[in-house]
Amino acid sequence: MLASVRVNQLQRLLLSARRLSSSPIIPPSRLLHQRLFSTSDTDASAASFSSSHPKIQTLEGKASNKSRSTSSTTSLNEDELAKFSAIADTWWHSEGPFKPLHQMNPTRLAFIRSTLCRHFSKDPSSAKPFEGLKFIDIGCGGGLLSEPLARMGATVTGVDAVDKNVKIARLHADMDPVTSTIEYLCTTAEKLADEGRKFDAVLSLEVIEHVANPAEFCKSLSALTIPNGATVLSTINRTMRAYASTIVGAEYILRWLPKGTHQWSSFVTPEEMSMILQRASVDVKEIAGFVYNPITGRWLLSDDISVNYIAYGTKRKDLGDI
């Protein structure tokens, strides 16, 4: 009965949010613009992209005039790391704080299999379509994404800045001879980029909304990607619907997540994501939304990107490494 009441509350909340928001995109504050776009350099392709997007022209006008940072600049947010360290032991509890990720994982993997098989000319019906490819999972947590990627044949490196997450991931992976081959590292994307590591595909799901500097973070992801390699990111749109469902609904009504897990001001719109990646030499090729059905408890791929969405892009081979 309690679960039914909570679902009904969430449905009413989402309906109210739809009425409140006539547009799925809500302009961010000046502070957020400075956090997202902390560099003044723009290449020709970024300028071209911006000129066709009036909203992004506004964003660029408010960007900080700081000089370009090197890849060694960290994008870590210590407060966010502390949050995830506190619940690291629950990564593989399917009914715990990470229940939404467990439920979303099959849908995320369906998008990844489809786009990356197409990108690398692989057979999506194969049991191991990613055999022979090197993938890196940035912000891997307990390994929810790294493990199925390894089972699909990829040589996987999982990276997380929280030591407890990495330990949990290693312990769980060691229970399976296939996943035990995953290389788990407690480090950052920036450090690996400085070391010159390269991968066929770089994936970072539900991470960018937790970093201190998304633009710098995406530069590091690009630096880790081989020319013409693939990049996959997922995050939460900054809309009233997203606030209603991911913060009010998931944290306060359904209590799937600890209160304070998400900050609405840190959510990233698809326009911002596209421009950030464009500046990092990654061209976004496809974006899909995730829609949750509270009756079935399942997530579906959708054209609706007003809350959760996932993006696939390619590293421009003509520009080489950044």
UniProtKB/Swiss-Prot annotation:
Entry EC no(s): 2.1.1.64, 2.1.1.-, 2.1.1.114
Gene3D superfamilies reported in the protein's UniProt record: Vaccinia Virus protein VP39
Cellular component GO terms held in the UniProt record: extrinsic component of mitochondrial inner membrane; mitochondrial envelope
Annotated Mg(2+) binding sites: 206, 209-210
Residues noted as binding S-adenosyl-L-methionine in the record, renumbered to the chain: 108, 139, 160, 205
Region described as Disordered: spans on this chain: 46-75
Pathway(s) this gene product operates in, as recorded in its UniProt entry: Cofactor biosynthesis; ubiquinone biosynthesis
Transit peptide start and end: 1-37
EC class of the enzyme, as a word: transferase
Quaternary structure and partners: Component of a multi-subunit COQ enzyme complex.
HAMAP family found in the cross-reference section: UbiG (MF_00472)
Function: O-methyltransferase required for two non-consecutive steps during ubiquinone biosynthesis. Catalyzes the 2 O-methylation of 3,4-dihydroxy-5-(all-trans-polyprenyl)benzoic acid into 4-hydroxy-3-methoxy-5-(all-trans-polyprenyl)benzoic acid. Also catalyzes the last step of ubiquinone biosynthesis by mediating methylation of 3-demethylubiquinone into ubiquinone. Also able to mediate the methylation of 3-demethylubiquinol into ubiquinol.
Family stated for the protein in its record: Belongs to the class I-like SAM-binding methyltransferase superfamily. UbiG/COQ3 family.
Name of the protein described by the UniProt record: Ubiquinone biosynthesis O-methyltransferase, mitochondrial
Source organism per UniProt: Arabidopsis thaliana
Organismal lineage: Eukaryota, Viridiplantae, Streptophyta, Embryophyta, Tracheophyta
Gene of this entry: COQ3
